[in-house]
From Swiss-Prot:
This is Non-homologous end joining protein Ku. Residues 253-290 are annotated as: Disordered. Residues 254-269 have a biased composition (Basic and acidic residues). InterPro entries: Ku70/Ku80_beta-barrel_dom, Prok_Ku, SPOC-like_C_dom_sf. The lineage of its organism: Bacteria, Pseudomonadati, Acidobacteriota, Terriglobia, Terriglobales. Keywords: DNA damage, DNA recombination, DNA repair, DNA-binding. GO terms for molecular function: double-stranded DNA binding. NCBIfam families: Ku_bact. One of its GO terms (biological process) is DNA recombination. It comes from Koribacter versatilis (strain Ellin345). With LigD forms a non-homologous end joining (NHEJ) DNA repair enzyme, which repairs dsDNA breaks with reduced fidelity. Binds linear dsDNA with 5'- and 3'- overhangs but not closed circular dsDNA nor ssDNA. Recruits and stimulates the ligase activity of LigD. The gene is ku. The keyword DNA damage applies. Belongs to the prokaryotic Ku family. The keyword Ribonucleoprotein does not apply. Homodimer. Interacts with LigD.
Length: 290
């Protein structure tokens, strides 16, 4: 099992249970190293004192808060531990809200909340109660040197915890001003188009084609080959007649196997390796003698 990122107690009312938090997802991205263009050696980043130019070791560095230009208050890590709120070790559910009332825009990072030894029964009780009531819990927890407000919601794996963006962190966006009226007939065909594209959510069928192309590019370099360029999409034509465009879209969907569009889009963007073309030598003309 993966290492937990937090452990402590979850409480609601007089009920308390030991729990652990585990990361709910992790990004998988290809990373590149920075190299010296001339000899392809790795580039090192050093910590340098701005006053005397000395290269510093990690144990020579302290944390400081700049309260005035060029002047700092030095804070020791032990001092930060001393002022940790009780939520550093205890997560109390402060209230419950209906899941439908929470806009997903407030969800930040996801974690699995699992019971620790001795907390299995109250944990199972909470999971079942949340499922049957369609409520989510709101609690507070301190980790990574910050106190988070979090959502607790039932999940097939037990309870999912989502850290919450605070109100002042969520950007507001006004709804676009719609000047033209949507006709009932247009809405009807739009519903049919949605149904034609509707399917069961299967996250395993979605992939990052760009990352796959980068891997293919690296492989091509190692094997002395090249990759063909992905054809750029044509600029979509401006929709003049919305009803006509809807009807054409629906007709195209009827001729298409359900769920096949994703495979088509991925295939159109996936690169293939090709033999590297020999470099073209420049032809040099004879010099004319005056």
């Amino acid at each position: 099992m993966a290492a937990s990122v937090w452990s402590g107690y979850l409480t609601f009312g007089l009920i308390s249970m030991p729990v652990r938090l585990f990361s709910g997802a992790r990004g998988s991205r290809i990373s590149f190293n920075q190299l010296h263009r001339e000899d392809h050696a790795r580039v090192k980043q050093q910590l340098v004192c701005s006053a005397d130019g000395k290269v510093l070791e990690r144990d020579e560095i302290v944390k400081g808060y700049e309260y005035r230009k060029g002047e700092y208050v030095i804070i020791d890590p032990e001092e930060l531990k001393k002022i940790e709120p009780k939520t550093a070790k205890s997560m109390e559910i402060l209230e419950f809200v209906k899941a439908e009332e929470v806009d997903p825009v407030y969800f930040e990072t996801s974690y699995y909340l699992q019971p620790d030894e001795g907390g299995e029964k109250p944990y199972a009780l909470l999971v079942q109660a949340l499922k049957e009531s369609d409520y989510m819990g709101i609690a507070k927890v301190t980790m990574h040197n910050r106190e988070y407000t979090v959502f607790l919601r039932p999940h097939t794996s037990g309870i999912m915890l989502h850290t919450m963006y605070y109100e002042d962190e969520v950007r507001k966006m006004e709804a676009p001003k719609i000047t033209s009226e949507v006709k009932p007939a247009e809405v009807k065909i739009a519903h049919q188009l949605i149904e034609a594209l509707a399917g069961k959510f299967e996250p395993e069928k979605f992939h990052d084609v760009y990352e796959a192309n980068v891997k293919k590019l690296i492989e091509a370099h190692l094997e002395g080959q090249d990759v063909e360029a992905v054809a750029k999409p044509a600029k979509p034509a401006k929709v003049v007649d919305l009803m006509d465009a809807l009807k054409q879209s629906l007709a195209a969907m009827k001729d298409q196997k359900k769920g096949s569009r994703l495979a088509e889009v991925d295939k159109e963007s996936t690169v293939q390796m090709t033999p590297k073309k020999p470099a073209v030598k420049e032809r040099r003309g004879r010099k004319r003698v005056a």
